[in-house]
Amino acid sequence: MKLQKLRNIGIIAHVDAGKTTLTERLLHFTGALHSMGEVHHGGTVTDHMVQERQRGITIASAAVTVGWRDHRINIIDTPGHIDFNIEVNRSLRVLDGAVVVFDSVAGVEPQSETNWRLADQYGVPRICLVNKMDRIGADYLRVVAMIRERLGAQPLVVHLPVFVEETYVGLIDLTTMSLHRWNADDGWKYSSEEITPEYQEQAAQYRAQLEETLVELDDELLEGWFNGATLQADDLKRLIRQGVVSGAFVPVLCASAFKNKGVQMVLDAVVDYLPSPQEVKGMETVDGAQIVDADVDGAFAALAFKVVNDKHGALTYVRVYRGTLQSGSRVLNTNVGQYERIGRIYEMHADRKVARDRIGAGDIVALVGMKHTQTGDTLCAPEAPLVLERINAPEPVMDIVIEPKSRQDQDRLGEALRAIVGEDPSLRLSTGAAGETLVSGMGELHLEIVVDRLQTDFDIAVTVGRPQVAYRETITQSAAVDYVYKKQKGGPGQFAEVRMRFEPIAGDGIEFESQIVGAAIPREYIPAVEDGVRQAARSGVLGGYPCGGFKAVLLDGAYHAQDSSQLAFSVAGREAFKEAMAQATPRLLEPVMAVEIVTPRDHVGDCIGDLMRRRGSILNQLDRGDACVINAEAPLAEMFGYIGDLRTMTAGRASFSMTFSHYAETPQGVADAVLNAD
């Protein structure tokens, strides 16, 4: 198939906006699925994990392929829960377009904003879908306004919903100025008719706005439009596509996926408005020396964006950016400098595999036989090595202790955890001070799924400690240190001297700078100093928590021609950091969460009072229909078990969502309690 007829898209949204239901309908309406499943019945294709079907949520991104109007569409359905945001991150990294789904009542929600920023970061063209138009209180134009105000985007109204009394029955397509009305009993069937009188004025108003926006993209059409020329539907669709690809605006559609209304128009929009691999900007290499454009005739280049372990071994999901690949070929993993032999190639349909002998630029497939490849690694032709930008995983904010109930399972537990962590870059595996196994993740649900998988997928009974906050440490003042490492016990010794300055910086990262002039320290030893600092920063001086938010500057030093080594300078850097941190007024940092609560108005006071008792701060209050939306920030340490307390306060009528915001200094009294407890 020609690249022009290929679409690689993702379905992204806040949890419960209807992503998976929409994906199920897309599969059904394209003929890829004969019998539709439902999320609430645990029978959908893309939610195939046991944990997904039990909980009715998407946990892992799933890839499926469908055909529509002679086009092939690779679809990745992503999770909406913040704990699994790494799945959205790595999916957007390899996609050419996205359908962003919004609930017609809730509108733009916290995870909608997080996903939107990720799509901005990767420059992914988007179309928006206001879903669940059958809900009581559905307000399409209010959601359009929220897209403009909360996301800073330029929404382009392409559809208008049509209601009979309060029942959603169809939509007006402003490009063709026709009304599509669905059969009440069969979403496959709809009629296209003239716009009814009660909608003609509104349709004319929004059609004029649509034309006014689009003609700005074409000088010739603009001149004709000013002279009264009528714009044709094909011209409008071409200009919408042009604006979507350039990021000038986002078309907004409407539908009710669950009621099977509007699904065909979503598929049409994917084909008409979202770009092919050839229409998006090529992928830049890490060194900036190359732009990898979609070209089947070039040297092979691909990015591994996901690794999944199933009963048959590891599946490595890749996006091919350039060239072609056949099963049995040998490729180079440039991140680790290892060659890989491709065993089999599969086109994935959720958990079902279709074998392929050959793939090319634009394809998203799974490879079997990878032994050294992890998420974010580049695979390429050995004769044309390059490195693509890796996928950055967020830092975990919560830890749990996991131990096997039987000592005989200790080794199996380690192997299982390494397999799970290998699949999910937002998980971390470490050993605590007492030798216990620590698993760090993005939230309570994230870690619950890990425990559930250990017991269900690996048949290992475990005991689990209470979730703990992933604290950090930082410095608040500058400190200078002159450290000499000298070791002499007969034979070759060890010697290294470093003079360093450590200073606080914004954020929680670590920066290193060498100001060495001349040959005070040979160039080959300077990376060892940085490595020593970074190793030491894994365990701060207050409570052994990771340390960040500082810059290390190597000012001067000395070496010995016979006794100096990389090891000696690494030790010197490590010990210099420890001394400096003790002098630089270290402080404990805690993760602060962005919290959104949707509550009936008569419970607003209770919710705000409870948040204040949890050391929270209220950012704003907004009206949403008959409810009130409270936006706040609160320390994660105070939010464990919050959902139960909220249900009690509001008789089960309120809901909330929580996303990581930033790290902030822990109040001294709280910090003392945390450190003394440790």
Curated annotation (Swiss-Prot):
GO molecular function, one term: GTPase activity
Location, primary (coarse class): cytoplasm
GO terms for biological process, alphabetical: ribosome disassembly
GO cellular component: cytoplasm
Binding-site residues for GTP, renumbered to this chain: 13-20, 77-81, 131-134
Record keywords: Cytoplasm, Elongation factor, GTP-binding, Nucleotide-binding, Protein biosynthesis
Subcellular location: Cytoplasm
SMART domains: EFG_C (SM00838), EFG_IV (SM00889)
Residues covered by the tr-type G domain: 4-278
Tree of life domain: Bacteria
NCBIfam families assigned: EF-G, PRK12740.1-5, small_GTP
Listed HAMAP family: EF_G_EF_2_B
Function of the protein: Catalyzes the GTP-dependent ribosomal translocation step during translation elongation. During this step, the ribosome changes from the pre-translocational (PRE) to the post-translocational (POST) state as the newly formed A-site-bound peptidyl-tRNA and P-site-bound deacylated tRNA move to the P and E sites, respectively. Catalyzes the coordinated movement of the two tRNA molecules, the mRNA and conformational changes in the ribosome.
Homology family: Belongs to the TRAFAC class translation factor GTPase superfamily. Classic translation factor GTPase family. EF-G/EF-2 subfamily.
Protein name per Swiss-Prot or TrEMBL: Elongation factor G 2
Source organism: Hahella chejuensis (strain KCTC 2396)
